[in-house]
C-alpha cells in the first residue's frame, strides 16, 4: 500500500505541474520543440534531469561498492564530459538547420537520402525504446521490492505516469517536470548522504570504502584498475561520449533552447548532473567502508539505506528514484514522437500520431523490461554502444566533411551489423577484451566505412 500511495502522489504532482505551467498543445512546433523559447536556467535543469537515468542512480552506487575508485571514475567523468563536448555540435546544427526538429531530418536534408533517413530513424528510435526499458527495469525492481507487488505491474504503473503528462503538451511538459524532478533528486540525494554519514562514522568510512567492498580497487593504474578500464571503463566511455550525439532527446533540446543560450545551458546541465553520481557514489563507498553485504549489488544503495536509516527516509528516496527514472522516460517519449515529423511532415495530425507513437514505444519497452534475467548494466552498455554507431558520420557531417549519402548509410550499417554483435558477444560471454573491441569497432567502422564508401561513390 505504501508504494502505491507514493506512486499516486507522484502522478498527481507531475500532472498538476504540467497543467499549471503548460497548455495542451496541438501544433507540432509547440509539441516537439516548445516554440524554440526555452531559457538557459530551465534548459540546464532539463538537460541534467534527462541525463539522470537509471545507471546514474543505481550503477554509480554499484560501481563505488564493487569497483571502488576506478569504477566511479569511469562512470562519472565521461558522463560529464560528453555533455560539454556536445556543445559546439549543438550550436552547429542549430546554425545549419535552424527550423529543424530532429537529427534524422538534418541528415536526410544534407544527403537527400531515404536510406540515411531510415538508418538514423532506426538508431534513434531503437535507442529511445531501449533507454526506456532500462528505466522501467530499474524502477520496477525497486518498487516491486518495496510494495511486494508484481514487477510487471510496477513497469506498467511507471509507464502510465510518464504518458499521462507527456501526451498533454509534449516537450513543454517534459521540460517543466524535469525542473521539479531535478529538485527532488538533488534534495533527496543530499539528505541521504548527510544522514548516512552521521550513521556510519562520517568521511572515515568513505575513505575506508574507496577500494570497494573487497578493498582491491584503489587505483586507476593498478592491475584491477586496468581490468575495470577494459571490461567497463572503455565501453562505458565510448557509449557515454557518444551519448548525446546518438540520442534525439538532446538534439531536440538543441532545437528548443533559445539559440544564444545553447552553450551555457549544456555546460550548466553537465555540472548539475555531476552532483548526482557523486551523491549516490558516496552512498556506495559508505556501504563498502562499513562492511555492508548487499544481496544484489545493483540495488546496493536501496538495500543500504533501508537497513541503516529510519523507514520514513524511504519516502524521499522513492521520490528521488522515480524522478530520475521518469525524467528520462518522458524525454524518450518526446524524442520518439518527434521522429514522426520526418516521415509525415508537420501538422495537427502529426501530433495525434506522435501521441500514438508514445504508446507504442511504452508497449515495446515494457515487454523488453520484463525479459527474465535482464540486468540494468548489460542493457545500458548495449544501448550505449548502439548510440556510438552514428557518432562519427554525424560529427563529420556537422563539420562539413565530404561524405555521400551512400557512404553514411554504409558506415552506420557496418557499425550496426559488425561492431554491435561483437560487443554483444563479449558482454554475454564476459570477455572484457571482446567488449572493448566491439565498442571501438562500432565507433570507428562507421566513420572509416563512410569515408571509404563516399570516395568510391565520388570516383564512380
Write out the residue ranges for each language-model feature:
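Membrane-embedded helix-loop-helix hairpins and adjacent transmembrane boundary segments
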Residues: 1-460
Amino acid at each position: 500500500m505504501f508504494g502505491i500511495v507514493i506512486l499516486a502522489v507522484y502522478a498527481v504532482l507531475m500532472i498538476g505541474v504540467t497543467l499549471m505551467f503548460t497548455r495542451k498543445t496541438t501544433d507540432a512546433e509547440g509539441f516537439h520543440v516548445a516554440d524554440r523559447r526555452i531559457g538557459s536556467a530551465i534548459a540546464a535543469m532539463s538537460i541534467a534531469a534527462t541525463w539522470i537515468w537509471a545507471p546514474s542512480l543505481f550503477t554509480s552506487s554499484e560501481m563505488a561498492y564493487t569497483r571502488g575508485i576506478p569504477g566511479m571514475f569511469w562512470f562519472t567523468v565521461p558522463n560529464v564530459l560528453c555533455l560539454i563536448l556536445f556543445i559546439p555540435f549543438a550550436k552547429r546544427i542549430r546554425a545549419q538547420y535552424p527550423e529543424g526538429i530532429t537529427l534524422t531530418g538534418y541528415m536526410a536534408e544534407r544527403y537527400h537520402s531515404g536510406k540515411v533517413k531510415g538508418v538514423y530513424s532506426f538508431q534513434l528510435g531503437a535507442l529511445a525504446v531501449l533507454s526506456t526499458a532500462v528505466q522501467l527495469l530499474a524502477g520496477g525492481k525497486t518498487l516491486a521490492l518495496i510494495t511486494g507487488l508484481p514487477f510487471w505491474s510496477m513497469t506498467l504503473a511507471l509507464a502510465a505516469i510518464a504518458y499521462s503528462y507527456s501526451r498533454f503538451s509534449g516537450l513543454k511538459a517534459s521540460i517543466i517536470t524535469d525542473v521539479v524532478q531535478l529538485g527532488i533528486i538533488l534534495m533527496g540525494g543530499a539528505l541521504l548522504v548527510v544522514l548516512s554519514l552521521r550513521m556510519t562514522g562520517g568521511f572515515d568510512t568513505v575513505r575506508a570504502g574507496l577500494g570497494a567492498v573487497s578493498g582491491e580497487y584503489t587505483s586507476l593504474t593498478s592491475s584491477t584498475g586496468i581490468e575495470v578500464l577494459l571490461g567497463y571503463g572503455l565501453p562505458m566511455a565510448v557509449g557515454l561520449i557518444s551519448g548525446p550525439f546518438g540520442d534525439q532527446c538532446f538534439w531536440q533540446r538543441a532545437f528548443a533552447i533559445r539559440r544564444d543560450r545553447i552553450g551555457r545551458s549544456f555546460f550548466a546541465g553537465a555540472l548539475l548532473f555531476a552532483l548526482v553520481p557523486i551523491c549516490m557514489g558516496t552512498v556506495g563507498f559508505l556501504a563498502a567502508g562499513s562492511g555492508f553485504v548487499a544481496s544484489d549489488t545493483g540495488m546496493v544503495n536501496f538495500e543500504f539505506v533501508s537497513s541503516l536509516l529510519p523507514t520514513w527516509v524511504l519516502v524521499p528516496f522513492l521520490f528521488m528514484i522515480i524522478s530520475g527514472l521518469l525524467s528520462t522516460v518522458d524525454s524518450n517519449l518526446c524524442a520518439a514522437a518527434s521522429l514522426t515529423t520526418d516521415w509525415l511532415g508537420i501538422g495537427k495530425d502529426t501530433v495525434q500520431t506522435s501521441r500514438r507513437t508514445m504508446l507504442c514505444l511504452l508497449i515495446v519497452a515494457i515487454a523488453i523490461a520484463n525479459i527474465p534475467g535482464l540486468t540494468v548494466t548489460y542493457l545500458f552498455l548495449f544501448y550505449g554502444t548502439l548510440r556510438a554507431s552514428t557518432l562519427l558520420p554525424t560529427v563529420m557531417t556537422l563539420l562539413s566533411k565530404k561524405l555521400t549519402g551512400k557512404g553514411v548509410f554504409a558506415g552506420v550499417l557496418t557499425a550496426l551489423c559488425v561492431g554491435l554483435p561483437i560487443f554483444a558477444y563479449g558482454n554475454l560471454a564476459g570477455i572484457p577484451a571482446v567488449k572493448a573491441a566491439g565498442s571501438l569497432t562500432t565507433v570507428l567502422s562507421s566513420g572509416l566505412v563512410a569515408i571509404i564508401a563516399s570516395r568510391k561513390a565520388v570516383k564512380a
